[in-house]
A protein has these predicted regions:
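ATP/NTP phosphate-donor binding region
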Residues: 1-35, 39, 47, 75-91, ...
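Residues in the short beta-alpha loop(s) of Rossmann-like NAD(P)-binding domains
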Residues: 10-12, 179, 232
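Short hydrophobic core segments
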Residues: 36, 116, 146-150
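Short glycine/serine/threonine-rich phosphate/pyrophosphate-binding segments
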Residues: 43-48, 155-159
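Gly/Ser-rich helix-loop-strand patches that form or flank binding pockets
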Residues: 47, 51-62
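Catalytic core of DAGKc-family lipid kinases
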Residues: 67-144
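ATP/nucleoside-binding phosphotransfer catalytic cores, i.e., glycine-rich phosphate-binding loops
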Residues: 105, 118, 134-137, 185-257
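Gly/Ser/Thr-rich active-site loops/lids in small-molecule metabolic enzymes
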Residues: 140-143, 148-184
């Protein structure tokens, strides 16, 4: 790639006009795009990864958020790294996705780059959850919820709940309880080929919700089952070093101590 043409959604023309940029409807932009640039934090990357999934375009995150763990370009690096992007001097980091569907008549489904979370509503009592791996009961939790995370998501909510950090190239799924009412309820790591089912137990005057990457919540009821497995799609993140994840851990997580 020796030269670049910048495309932007036409609805941004008034608020973000830049001379030389082509403003087109979104459905025309994406098929012509080589790389999607996001400007924001991790939430922006997660949103765009799901929103543009069908186009399978690499994403480069430019961080102006608080952490920007998934972004590999800081504002003060833009000139250098965008020039490298135009020259084709970058790498593509393939990240696995989770596919989730709620079993039942409506069959709600979604994808997650970071995590699938089943949790109780605010100020509600603890809820019982049963975890099945390939239809075999492996754990029963009573607590505030359960996080099912990818290696990408292992440094996000799952980590804050006590889960392990996985190398982004590890082929695994992390299941982490949220505030379990037990001294012996550790996070568990499963092979990516496994099918994970989360079954909601008895619910008394409680609200239970499922969300993918922190997006809109889907309500669950007693007896509901969410089936989670490896998606047949991936997300490609633009990176400039194979060590970017470990550099981010050192610079953006340890630096907070």
């Amino acid at each position: 790639m020796q030269e670049a043409v910048v495309l932007m959604r036409d609805e941004l023309k008034e608020s973000c006009y830049v001379e030389g940029v082509q403003y087109l409807p979104l459905e025309e932009c994406l098929p012509r795009t080589d790389v999607i640039l996001t400007i924001g934090g991790d939430g922006t990357i997660l949103h765009e990864a799901n929103f543009t999934l069908q186009y399978q375009k690499p994403i480069l995150g430019i961080n102006i958020g608080r952490c920007g763990f998934l972004a590999t370009c800081e504002v003060d690096e833009m000139e250098e790294k965008l020039a490298a992007l135009v020259r084709g001097e970058y790498l593509l980091d393939n990240r696995m996705l989770l596919y989730v569907r709620v079993l039942g008549e409506d069959g709600w489904e979604g994808h997650a780059l970071n995590d699938v979370v089943v949790t109780k509503g605010r100020l509600q009592q603890a809820i019982d959850f049963s975890i099945y791996c390939d239809d075999i009961l492996v754990e029963h939790y009573r607590g505030d919820g359960v996080i099912v995370a990818t290696p990408t998501g292992s440094t996000a909510y799952s980590l804050a709940a006590g889960g392990p950090i996985l190398d982004s190239q590890t082929k695994g799924i992390v299941v982490t309880p949220i505030c379990p009412h037990s001294l012996t309820s550790p996070a568990m790591v499963f092979a990516q080929e496994r099918k994970i089912n989360i079954c909601v137990g008895q619910v008394i005057d409680n609200e239970v919700f499922l969300s993918c990457d922190g997006a809109a919540e889907y309500p669950l009821s007693a007896g509901s089952t969410a089936e989670i497995r490896l998606s047949d799609q991936i997300v490609q993140l633009v990176t400039f070093s194979r060590a970017d994840q470990f550099q981010a851990i050192d610079q953006k997580l340890r630096s907070r101590r």
